[in-house]
Amino acid sequence: MKVTRILWLPLSFLNFIERRYDTMTTQKQSALQTIEEKKSLIAGIADKVWEFAELSLQEFKSAETYCEALEKEGFDVERGTCNIETAFAASYGHGRPYIGILAEYDALSGLSQEGGLIERKEKKAGGNGHGCGHNLLGAGAFAAALGIKAYLEQNDVSGTVILYGCPGEEGGAAKAFMARDGLWKKLDAALTWHPEDVNEVATGSSNSCIQTQYKFTGIASHAAGAPERGRSALDAVELMNIGVQFLREHMSDKARIHYAITDAGGCSPNVVQPRASVLYMVRSNHVAEAVELQKRVDKIAEGAALMTETTYEKKFIDGLADTVSNFALERVLYRNFEELGVPEYTEEENAYADALAETYDSSGVPGVAAENDENAKEQVEKMQKEYGHAMNGFLTPLYQKDAFKAGSTDVGDVSWLTPTAQIHVAAWPNGCPGHSWQNVSCDRTEIGHKAAVHAGKVIAATAIDLIEDTSLLDEARAEFEKRTKDGFVCPIPADAVPVIPD
């Protein structure tokens, strides 16, 4: 696999030069060469998981594929971590520092798609697909673990790498349940990545998120002949929704409440509906606020039941925290990303990505730096123009100020318990819509494979730096302690278990 080293200068266009390891230690070079030698294994696992396309908390084949591969590679593997069936933890090494690498492997419903095409074509009618690239995410984390293991194996140093298999990121929030159980506290640092349309070190906060299902039960009756005997569960759902609409005036600007009626009772209007359900999602950029807002939504559900003389059952689905940035770790990731450059694409790969980008609006300037800084935006625009293809074949500037994304991820829960940082590696052309068939198609190409392998190298190189120079971990820990001084408010009840909504 070829990569291009990119030097970013504030007042210049891209400069493409040959990749050099001049400043890399021989030990680090050797570890990264292990990843290069095993790229067929890494790509093969990515493709297997892509084929399985298992939904959240149902990733049995995907998880076992990783467990078997990790055992063959000499890791100690624990299945069913934190009593989550499709979770695992694979470790190698001894002593501190403990470096955690986070893997995901769940797919999305309704996104079945043939790989490598530039047109919509379902692989299986109504089937699932990896619209968020988690087949690549897990494979890249696996690659990183292989590289770190090689380093620990070849050098007489203290250190332990733990690859965590984290199911249900799209629904189930396994990392959040693991956080509730204290799993992440033992780590000195956690590193991960996500496929994107850009090469960058990710930063900034995200929304916390709590999902709860409310199931109302009433009494059926003839809506015309004996309406007084009926108690409408559907009325309760509607009154709950009205109550929440009035709550919106009394929450912060960044808070959000979404809902979906998952059961309207039936399709006969002349029946007083005896059952109805609604699924609520409460978001805020601070997990403590989300927890308090959720309590108010619970009271509205109780009030709706009282008004309609129905009963209700509350079913906790999942909850996750906002993300805590760690600039110290992000700087180490960026130094290694700069040194390793970004994946290089063939003419055929660029032609495919260019054609795929014609199927959606591919305009826009990518990356967190461009979103938050006008000077950075100008630089990235120049980089795009210089590169001249839909793939963003360059590394965007490091951004070290506050930033915010409205979405949610259970990586946030990890970041509240240990210093955490992540990168994005381009696996799709610019502006590729999230959770789309285009993503699924690109995930099953060499472009996707290159992203996974390269992410593994950047993460492994960073972990090696942390092991070799623990003062970097001290700096990251000091920043972490400052940012989390108010303490972690866990959104997961003590008795909750990961579930799939009805």
Features from the language model and the residues they span:
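Short, Lys/Arg-enriched N-terminal segments with co-localized hydrophobic residues
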Residues: 6-23
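Acidic/His- and Gly-rich active-site-bordering loop/insert found
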Residues: 26-130, 135, 139-143, 147-159
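General structural feature for long, well-ordered alpha-helical segments within catalytic domains
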Residues: 27, 38-45, 58-69, 97, ...
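Divalent metal-coordination and catalytic microenvironments
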Residues: 49, 101, 134, 163, ...
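Histidine/acidic-residue-rich, glycine-tolerant segments that coordinate divalent metal ions
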Residues: 86, 108-110, 118-129, 135-136, ...
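Metal-dependent amide/peptide-bond hydrolase catalytic core
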Residues: 238-502
